[in-house]
């Protein structure tokens, strides 16, 4: 059964903020940065009062202040040595906080340590002090610092060099990453610094791949520092897990045994995550001794869209000289909020910028520098600025929608209020179920445990991608210590040898890489190859048709030209062109000629940045991964970048380039997909409340079949356009709930729509999944089927959205009872009548949220969670064409049987044993949870005993159903009750001779 599902980035869009409510103009100031008031506390308080009386009036549902906390100074100090203590003193550090002292002490004891304390608590000092103290005693030693983002590297290098400058000896530090010039790389390899700063990507492609050139470092490596540990979660975490297995192998080969030290935001399982990623035993430091300033929270449930409210809050904050950051959940929303905040306010355009993934590196560095220096007072961003990039002290954080996890929420909130500054955090709820859950239950947010981070070592695709790289670095053997406990290692070796990616030695004891550089084929951050979005081509936009594009042969190669963009502060004029005649420029110095056709559609021609010469320049505006290619950059899509609209044209596969042209149109676009699931392998099964929950390998197929043009404002669909795109297929891990026909009959007898009930339950369950584990809303997918072709019964599937899985589905399977309870409480507690975005609507449902049955969803969740029982009459199914037969395989076999002949009755003798006792499941009234260990059946026709294990329970039930008489002892009171945990079949229908009942009677 195929269900239509949407693009994950599809969001509810609306009218931009109305101009009649805009704040007063920004006062004219002298050239240079805007300096915020020193009295931040009073400004934040006044701003909060202003918002309560104006923009947020009557929409604040909860206010809470996290009070300040005093510092806890270490009672004793680790002996770092006089040199390091002098350097710290020169940096203004006269004492250590308690968690810093604890971490340094553990490191000096030789332990591997993970420090998981809140943002801005001085975690970096732990590893900097310990590493410097050690390298002063061992000057031939070296350390490698690994950061997930290049921007974090530069921050760390600046901080390190400040410390190193005060040392009497010549310890050095350098950055080695993709932006490092070739001649600088060569110099670094020849003159190895004491501290090498890099990223996982460069560690993979530039260091491990050429480890012979790094012999000196690998021989003398004493420290491996990994910052921002919590980011190594999900698919990226699974890649990094194998990356460090490879690094550990090489260190052992070169004779070094470095210590690990890692820092993380506060997560629920720092020790477990570190041990899983690095393959070592860790000690965690989690109690912070750093002081904190008061942080005020406002939970806001706006009547209008949170996107427009965010734009007005950004304007209001910047106009009051409060440094304001707005976090959104999607790139398109980032661009829209930025555009709406600046399009009517040219005075604000110089003080606000957008920032997200996909911007060019030099663009991002320029924005970061302007924020740090105070040239910018406001920024709209996705999660790209969530990490510890130094962008100066911020005062106000606006969250446009719940970020998806407690971890990410606190990480984003931690961007404001540094250096003892009082701060304000505003959570603007969307109508999504998870947002509304916290609007109704704010105490659940503030009192909730931090989520666990998940990194799955068992992803077979990622394992098979890394093993050829590992074999190229060092030949692999069957007994690799670093792969001990990695599920599927032996099978992966065999599969890679069969495919020709690995070559097995003649004696069969070693495996070698078939390719010279398999590292080049592995991208740890994206699904598929990266494509460049190139602007500068002409395009005519019709009302419903995609633009005409040049042929692939005639399209020039993009030149390296800085794209037109809104100017940063300090530009000579507002548009950055230096020429007031360019009144048609779109905030970027690129003259735009436009006219309006009879149909009202814009006809736009994008001239080149070098218009004077008459030569058109093509320039790269961003990149997109192969995984997003067909959902974001299909021909005819509207792509937003720095507040400008670009019409996507043709794709050029050989160069991996996508044409784009500047346009100004009153609509946005969203794709439509079809999906289906196929069960490949069952990995686990457990009885629930009259049904089975199973975990297994799935094949998910999706195809973008069309896109819609949707008018901004009233959300009217202007037109639909078919698309031809390839089917995208991947294997993953998921769990599913199998519901026999009585569930359908029960729902229908109670007046509910079967498919609508399943569909609503899938939506609601998927919405609350991030409460179980650290994940984004797009990390899990779902599909429901009223009659799955393989199962021949109704089913709801929840699966990881990445090839091979990332461990989330296993988490959901293990905590299924909790997930169903949370979902039931959320849906039943919603005040709406027929369903809404706060309970069963899903913002990106490709079926337009139809059909949905809220009452049926509640009823079904009550059945699934054991709060209600199936109606006994639901088992007596009428013979209707639309109802599948109960236990279809058995009934078909009966239909195909030859005419009944005179023979003896079919009698079986049956008994079973359970895995758990009554005490272990909570009493004899919960025998359905005791789980089958084995069942034994003697059959008079074959005169044989048959043993059934738990995975064979469906066959056991079929065997019992096929008998004319079942003989057992207490099978009615006990054995059938245990089997009811696996099936909704009414076992009272079986003709049974229960000897215990016969004795009692």
Annotated model-derived regions:
Residues 2-23, 28-35, 555, 574-575, ...:
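Acidic, low-complexity intrinsically disordered tails
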Residues 2-98:
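Helicase-associated low-complexity/disordered flanking segments
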Residues 17-36, 538-615:
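Intrinsic disorder/low-complexity segments
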Residues 53-89, 95-98, 102, 108-109, ...:
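Helicase motor core with emphasis on the C-terminal RecA-like subdomain
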Residues 126:
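Hydrophobic positions on the alpha1 helix immediately C-terminal to the Walker A/P-loop
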Residues 423-425, 431-448, 456, 466-482, ...:
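Extended Lys/Arg-rich polyanion-binding regions
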Residues 888-965:
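Conserved RNase H-like, two-metal-ion catalytic cores of nucleic-acid enzymes
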Residues 937-1001:
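Conserved DEDDh/DEDDy metal-dependent 3′-5′ exonuclease domain
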